[in-house]
Amino acid sequence: MSNSYFRKRTTLGLMLTLFTALIVTPSAIAQNAFPQVSATALKTMESDGKEIAIIDPREEGVFGEAHLLYAVNLPLSKLELNIFRMIPRKTTRIILTDGGEGTSGRAAVKLSEFGYSNVAILEGGYPAWKNAGYEVFSGMSVEGKAFGEWITVHYQTPTMTPEQVQERIARGEKVLILDSRPSNEYVNMNIPGSINVPVSELVFRFFQLGVSPDTLVVVNCAGRTRSLIGAQTLINAGIPNKVAAMRGGTMAWQMAGFPLEHGTTRHAPEPWGANLQKALQTARNVADRYGVKVISAKQLEAYKADQNRSLYIIDLRTPDEYRAGHRHDSTYGWGVQLVQGMDKYAATHKARVVLIDNYMVRALMTASWMVQADWPETYVLADPFEGVSLDTGDYKPLVPGSEQIGMPRIKAMELNTQLQAKKATVIDVADSLSYKKGHIPGAWFAIRSRLDEALRKIPQSSNLVVTGDDPALVALTGRDLAKISGKPVSILEGGNAAWRKANLPITAGFENLATKTDDIFLQPFLWGQFEPMSPEFKQAANAYFEWELELPGRLERAKETNFKVVSLEEKK
């Protein structure tokens, strides 16, 4: 690629791949135990109209360097945590791909143990795909981000720079900035004065804001594509205001030298009465324009009974609404996060998707984008909560094998005593950014899938203790560590949260690294949290913008997508 940010990282990944390919490992043996498919065969499969899940089990940071367009990243270290949600049907056609180093073989063994019966491996991984003349992509959620850029080209979505927006505000003009990101991103950093309205909520909540028609509405996100789809959502809805997307979002705002707010919780109110009815009618009009289908509970049951097709039932309401009561057969997703990040919610292309929203507005608007984004069998469920029992709390994934884990536990105060007496070694399997922000003093960062490597660096003590942020991942790591080390292993009860709750010491930084910190693909907006005005941040942000702008052209060359974007006039 032309931008140096991704090119340098990709070159390093290829060098590591060539080095590891020279070593015969158990991964290579496992690789040969499963059917192999060639790059040309996989290319044919992508367009044969049948369901397919292309899975890349490398760590996110490695995956982000180079991968297939349709590959979904399910890291080997966390495979159990996501697999049943991401691939709900055990007979799904699954193709594993990696960098040629053999991670696919290890993942194939696990998938077989979990009951998946139709697993094959791309021979040679993405390097073989590239050598066959096919496009390889860098970055995360590429298909969704490409869709955002694609629709902008076709709809000619209006945009404004941060400087142009600030000039309007300085002149005293009426300007309303709507931040289209989820609330957890908004509270972390936001443009001063902006109101948080996630994209799927824009039409739902807009009329309740009582915006005068002469107000300029500017939609922002962290970068580009969510603001673009957000702005185009309001335009598609036919609101009378002039609407524009902020070019570059919070990253460009920072680069322009403008301050951000932190810890803000401003959000648009929930609609009621006439405003709710107006939102619903608007959403219905848009859905009709794009051929969105609404199905009954009876039709949903028929889909659930179909053993030959995959089905994803996704609840689009806010986190609080979901926790208050949700269908037991649903998973959680949030609007445009779904449209531009289906790789985080569903791994099977050509599957059926049913969207849930008690008011239907959010589901109808989201579905209007999904059917354009090559998810043609996307439906909205009518009366989704009628006659069904509801679960409460957060989504609880089924984790294969977790019910068989009975690890010894240690409380935070007891662990602190052992650490002071130098009788324990702590291994932290939280993500590397969380570890950097704060961890138990002396704890070693490690990635679960690399415990063999980690144990060669970690000083041995009489007790090994595993901690982290995800209880299931901590338990799985404890089980693996006991098997590999042959030593007594326990897990910290309550994990890192319990340690903090006990007001015990916390250390920041990359203190003890037992493995690489490539579990996260560090995107520029994350860099901005630490060094917002550094030359490195600005260089990375500009490279990111360049990368996004290149995506439509690269998709044209790849000829792998089937976006169905048409003008509003063509649909009337």
Predicted regions and their residues:
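Rhodanese-like catalytic fold shared by cysteine-dependent sulfurtransferases
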Residues: 2, 6, 28-53, 60-176, ...
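Bacterial N-terminal signal peptides
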Residues: 13-27
